[in-house]
């Protein structure tokens, strides 16, 4: 019998993308609430408890409510795509390539917290350098990022695409999170193995899907003897043996005139780059991904597949 999967919030941006990725699969059975019954709390609870894996694509409070509904049913495993549980030690963090043991933790977990889009890029760049002893304690990490507007869900999609929307956004690019208290900062700090919260400056561009995350570093403030080449080598070693996260060779990065935020649109992979001048004193680490791919729905399906393989 095929495992039953219920996407709670299947009509939202992330939920719809998950359904698209699972279309045509015969190895799982998708449970679904008829659209006319979407507000039926009893039916929702029944669906949650009938699933082998429930994928929650909900706001934080609604996710917490859903987890309570299945807390006594050990037959139900959960993948949550909100920020509610990402730094909860009782939940496996759903970034399988984060370190060598993470995929096995996800396979064995009952509860998996799907990573945020920005943290996927930031942690993907930072954690290997912390693990290798290159990025020292106390380093003032800065993360700058731009996302496609679908990361803001249906409301922002309407604001960006409908010029008649009462709160339409006409700017081609805008900063937000200006008080430096973005909800992804704790996640970056904990899973990036940082002892000091990074300064995070997010922004949105007038493109639907895609993301660039940047972490600039001063080499003189890193471990003694660190070079652009040694940083690249540490990243390459960290991600060896898998094909989801790739580290672009230095020669290929050097040949680039620009990085295109939408290059990986529709894909569930991530590319990492190390930019700088050989022998120079600075580097810029860059992660490229689809905010709805490896940054959300693609990661959720990847985590589901790992859990089903356990």
Swiss-Prot record:
Organism taxonomic ancestry: Bacteria, Pseudomonadati, Pseudomonadota, Alphaproteobacteria, Hyphomicrobiales
Class in the EC hierarchy, top level: oxidoreductase
Family: Belongs to the NAGSA dehydrogenase family. Type 2 subfamily.
GO terms assigned for molecular function: N-acetyl-gamma-glutamyl-phosphate reductase activity; NAD binding
Annotated protein name in UniProt: N-acetyl-gamma-glutamyl-phosphate reductase
EC number, UniProt record: 1.2.1.38
Compartments where located: Cytoplasm
NCBIfam families: argC_other (TIGR01851)
Protein's organism: Rhizobium etli (strain CIAT 652)
């Amino acid at each position: 019998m095929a495992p039953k999967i219920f996407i709670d919030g299947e009509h939202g941006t992330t939920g719809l993308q998950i359904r698209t990725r699972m279309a045509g699969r015969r190895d799982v059975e998708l449970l679904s609430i008829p659209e006319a019954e979407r507000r039926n709390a009893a039916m929702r609870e029944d669906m949650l408890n009938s699933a082998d894996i429930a994928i929650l694509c909900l706001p934080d409070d609604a996710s917490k409510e859903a987890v309570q509904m299945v807390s006594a049913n050990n037959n139900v495993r959960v993948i949550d795509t909100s920020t509610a549980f990402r730094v909860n030690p009782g939940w496996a963090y759903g970034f399988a390539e984060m370190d060598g043991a993470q995929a096995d933790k996800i396979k064995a977990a009952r509860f998996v917290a799907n990573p945020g889009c920005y943290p996927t890029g930031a942690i993907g760049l930072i954690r290997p350098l912390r693990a290798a002893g290159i990025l020292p304690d106390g380093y003032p990490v800065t993360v700058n990022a731009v996302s496609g507007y679908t990361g803001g869900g249906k409301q922002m999609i309407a604001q960006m695409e409908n010029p008649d929307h009462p709160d339409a956004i006409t700017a081609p690019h805008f900063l937000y999170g200006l008080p430096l208290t973005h909800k992804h900062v704790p996640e970056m700090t904990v899973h990036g193995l940082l002892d000091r919260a990074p300064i995070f400056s997010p922004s949105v561009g007038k493109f639907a899907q895609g993301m660039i995350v940047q972490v600039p570093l001063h080499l003189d403030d890193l471990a003694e003897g660190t070079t652009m080449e040694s940083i690249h080598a540490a990243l390459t070693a960290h991600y060896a043996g898998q094909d989801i996260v790739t580290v672009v060779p230095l020669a290929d990065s050097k040949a680039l005139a620009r990085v295109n935020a939408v290059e990986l649109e529709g894909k569930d992979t991530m590319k990492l780059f190390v930019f700088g001048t050989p022998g120079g004193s600075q580097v810029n680490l860059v992660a490229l991904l689809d905010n709805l791919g490896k940054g959300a729905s693609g990661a959720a399906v990847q985590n589901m597949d790992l859990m089903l393989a356990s």
